[in-house]
Amino acid sequence: DRQVGLFFWLWIGQPAATGAYDAGALLEQENGRDILFHQDVPESPDGQQHFWGKPLWGYYDSADEWVIRRQIELLMLAGVDFIVFDTTNARTYPQVYEQVLAVIQAYQQAGWNPPRAAFYTHSHSLDTVRVLYEELYRPGKFASAWYQLDGKPLIIAYTASAPDLAEAAIRGDTAYSPAELSPEILDFFTFKRPQWPFDPFYPDGFPWIEWTYPQPLHGDVMNVTVASHPNV
């Protein structure tokens, strides 16, 4: 029973975008590379995310319901079973994921079979799990839109503080001090371990991107990367 999932970003236009900046358009200019990489100018401000090109539906915001509906429609037509929200940097973007989950439920109520959704955590994983549990899962919001594995909502996260602290230490984050997850939370989810491409191979890992070819099998999960991270 094979299923297909896609990594899904929530942060386009969120939470502090000041405009739409197109790296492809900049590079077409005579001094575009210098503007993009070495200048802090209005057409390419430091600290702002840049589109690599103009998207199909224009320079959109991830919270735009019209765009979300088009995205879910295409995923349904492609036969995608689930999407995995990127909350790997300890931001959960509830103003966006609630819109996506509401659209999924609307399609369900109309008789369609849209992909369900799960979350991927990494930095400050345990704290992010707690936030998601309190924001979404404990109150049972949009429950029919949750992607479930082995009868429980799937979440990609650490289950203990030791690997979470080790990840923070790699980034020089010595102030992070997470409490252990409660038995209630540990029992609520089906957990998969975050698998970063430069980490050792984890048989139970859930990779969001893969740098190895042929792609390794992590238990029952294989990642097929069709477009890699811009820093690679």
Where are these regions (language model features)?
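Glycan-processing catalytic domains of CAZymes
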Residues: 1-232
